[in-house]
């Protein structure tokens, strides 16, 4: 077997069903091995390396399972690096297989095709686990090691590189078996009991959830019910608690409740807004639940740190929390939500379009946001009913991530509709992947809100820089004809009612992408509801 065949056999043994990729001479033996694997693993080729990497990211976010992409070295790796950074920031299990120049030439500066100075060093700054496959018998063990690292502690991406001549080297064939997952760390019963006592004695508890809570939705719901604690989610935590639950809240009301809270239980979240914007003081006890032992003390030492998988920790907390059944806070929170909705009414243009999307998207459909005015508002206003159905780019918040990421989600979850929202600026970062969607018959709906500008940048220039507008106005194609030229379905919607009708038609497509262009003007700023000042203590 060749090194590449060992690698593909290892991917299959570990349940990898798809490799998102863009081929090139450095990886020719790898693609030959993928061909020989037949239907056991599918190769989805894209039109740009960032498309392959973002598709793997979208598939990982939508399924919670590890995904793989393959690219050539040097420019191929660097073209995919924005997606790799985003995967790191979102703790997404994405494995990159990256080619290399001939092994004997690595680090010698000969000027080989796609040579890059210290590629391994660059990779090591982007991910926590990386390695080079140096001979055939290393391929399967290193893939197993990488996948194990990606799932241990804080999840995240990994990179394996392999020289072009090593991919084709051979060794005696042998069977490949999946490696056992890393054992879960034992629960710290003393710390859990301490946390349970604090929660049981609390008068105004608040739960904040991030992406690390997505697989503990039932446990979050039960603990929230027992404590009558509101659950705040922003971006990746959306959907952990169904938005229809009166205890489910978003950022603006969360800040008010942060000011009142005596105990905050933070589950799988960096707690960035609380520590850096809203402030802390001696009266606030913070309990951190995180898979990463370094995370709880990154900003400040918590009252209690619970390290491990959120699911068993929260289940145990719910069992141990003392005290009598608490009075319902549903009526109180519903009233406060209504007051907050009145304040958020200034975002009516965005809200109208988001309501149209929510009305047509099934409960289990997937919504992929973008760094655009509709996307910012969606993080505050869009109802989300289940984990992994609201995909948002985390702290990288990188423009242009959305369409290709949604394409990966749509490929991995062909059983549900997927809608990508984009601005005219961000969409053109990866709009060439319409060709990928058509070629592979992926039914994705993208809604392009066209205001003829990098709208957020333009508003900042108008409001904060004396209307000195520069480099923010855009000249765009006819998006409908542009999409149709790829073979996609396309139409234009001018208001929320027309958008609903267009979405209804789009979601009936099961083997073709659809683009819906929505011409819009400038929209009201959401930032007063996102970057909110301190409400207690010190930041």
Describe the residue ranges of each PLM region.
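N-terminal alpha/beta PP-like core and its mobile active-site loop of ThDP/TPP-dependent enzymes
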Residues: 1-321, 360-363, 436, 443-446, ...
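Alpha-helix N-cap/helix-start capping motif
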Residues: 24, 50, 269, 311, ...
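Acidic-residue sensor for enzyme active/binding pockets
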Residues: 49, 161, 370, 433, ...
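Active-site diphosphate/adenylate-binding microenvironment
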Residues: 3-8, 12-14, 22-25, 30-35, ...
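Phosphate/pyrophosphate-binding active-site segments
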Residues: 137, 173-175, 202, 283-371, ...
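Active-site-proximal loop/turn and secondary-structure-junction residues that shape catalytic pockets
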Residues: 164-166, 373, 520
């Amino acid at each position: 077997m060749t090194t590449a065949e060992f690698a593909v056999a290892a991917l299959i043994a570990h349940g990898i069903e798809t490799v998102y990729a863009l081929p090139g001479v450095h990886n020719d033996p790898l693609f030959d091995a993928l061909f020989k694997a037949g239907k056991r693993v599918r190769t989805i080729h894209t039109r740009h390396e960032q498309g392959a990497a973002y598709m793997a990211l979208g598939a990982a976010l939508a399924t919670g399972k590890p995904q793989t992409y393959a690219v050539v070295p040097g420019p191929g790796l660097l073209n995919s690096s924005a997606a790799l950074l985003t995967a790191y920031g979102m703790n997404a299990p994405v494995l990159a297989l990256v080619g290399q120049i001939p092994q004997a030439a690595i680090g010698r500066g000969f000027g080989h095709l796609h040579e890059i100075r210290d590629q391994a060093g660059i990779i090591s700054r982007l991910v926590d686990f990386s390695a080079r496959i140096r001979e055939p018998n290393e391929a399967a063990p290193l893939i197993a090691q990488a996948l194990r690292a990606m799932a241990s502690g804080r999840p995240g991406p990994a990179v394996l590189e392999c020289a072009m001549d090593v991919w084709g080297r051979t060794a005696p064939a042998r069977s490949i078996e999946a490696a056992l997952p890393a054992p879960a760390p034992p629960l710290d019963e003393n710390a859990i009991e301490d946390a349970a006592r604090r929660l049981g004695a609390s008068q105004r508890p608040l739960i904040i959830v991030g992406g690390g809570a997505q697989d503990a939705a039932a446990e979050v719901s039960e603990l929230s019910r027992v404590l009558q604690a509101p659950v705040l989610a922003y971006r990746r935590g959306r959907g952990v608690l169904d938005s229809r639950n009166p205890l489910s809240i978003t950022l603006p009301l969360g800040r008010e409740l942060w000011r009142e809270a005596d105990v905050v239980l933070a589950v799988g979240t960096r707690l960035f807004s609380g520590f850096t914007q809203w402030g802390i003081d001696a009266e606030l006890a913070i309990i951190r639940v995180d898979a990463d032992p370094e995370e709880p003390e990154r900003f400040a030492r918590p009252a209690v740190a619970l390290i491990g998988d959120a699911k068993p920790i929260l289940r145990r907390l719910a069992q141990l929390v003392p005290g009598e059944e608490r009075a319902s806070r549903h009526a109180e929170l519903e009233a406060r939500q209504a007051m907050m909705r009145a304040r958020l009414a200034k975002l009516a243009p965005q809200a109208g379009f988001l309501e149209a999307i929510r009305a047509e998207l099934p409960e289990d459909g997937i919504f992929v946001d973008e760094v655009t005015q509709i996307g910012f508002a969606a993080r505050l206003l869009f109802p989300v009913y289940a984990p992994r159905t609201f995909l948002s780019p985390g702290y990288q918040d990188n423009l242009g991530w959305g369409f290709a990421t949604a394409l990966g989600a749509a490929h991995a979850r062909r059983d549900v509709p997927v809608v990508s929202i984009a601005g005219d600026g961000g969409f053109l970062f990866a709009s060439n992947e319409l060709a990928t969607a058509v070629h592979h018959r992926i039914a994705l709906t993208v809604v392009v809100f066209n205001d003829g500008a990098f709208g957020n940048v333009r508003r900042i220039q108008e409001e904060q820089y004396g209307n000195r507008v520069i480099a923010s106005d855009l000249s765009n194609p006819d998006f409908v004809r542009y999409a149709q030229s790829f073979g996609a379905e396309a139409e234009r919607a001018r208001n929320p009612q027309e958008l609903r009708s267009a979405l209804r038609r789009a979601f009936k497509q099961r083997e073709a992408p659809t683009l819906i262009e929505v011409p819009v003007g400038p929209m009201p700023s959401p930032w007063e509801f996102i970057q909110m000042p301190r409400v207690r203590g010190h930041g």
